[in-house]
């Protein structure tokens, strides 16, 4: 599929005198596994909040699935799923109760909601504690439940902010396989993670934001081609990332400053 699932034009968000996101032009094709990277404070979370309707842009526009988000917020939200940085789960519910609530919120009928809830809880290995409140889940269990809630309605775009944080290796492998199958049937996945090895392994295309501005965008092959020298094809995503975000002359922390710890 080649149609664009996400298009932004000069997307900007200001907080007083601070410009957190500055004129971002982004294009994500339908069915892409897309990685969105940047240092801490670069504007990643602010961008995702604008793309998912949690923040209104100061200027510019975001179009999802051919719809202007500002003009058609309800229609867009019906077709997206989100696992945010702060999961915001209702901790006084059980996992099953929460998924049934989310399913009904998306207007799924009760039999469909019940069936999908049970299937998702089984897949996420959460069905063995039917009476356990979410408040008593581990962080990894809560992350898996948040992902289950984000996909229960069959979204066409899935936004994931650090989805594997706290998830054990066995479950993470199953989740990665599931996400890969979803992209094969045309679902667009927009992933942010500080674990660049995960992004490199899963994503076909990447964008890098730095100081609120988009500084790179393209396939991994295109980004590697931008690295000078014959070794460019062997360059890792981490090396690409450090090369790009380090161009402003920022220096890494010096260990000598903490000599009293060594």
Predicted features and spans:
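ABC ATPase "signature
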Residues: 217-218
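Conserved ABC ATPase "signature" region
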Residues: 100, 104, 111-129
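Conserved catalytic motifs of ABC-family nucleotide-binding domains
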Residues: 154
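A short, surface-exposed alpha-helical micro-motif characterized by mixed small hydrophobic
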Residues: 199-200
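Catalytic Walker B motif of ABC-type/P-loop ATPase nucleotide-binding domains
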Residues: 158-162
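Helical segment within the ABC ATPase nucleotide-binding domain
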Residues: 172-185
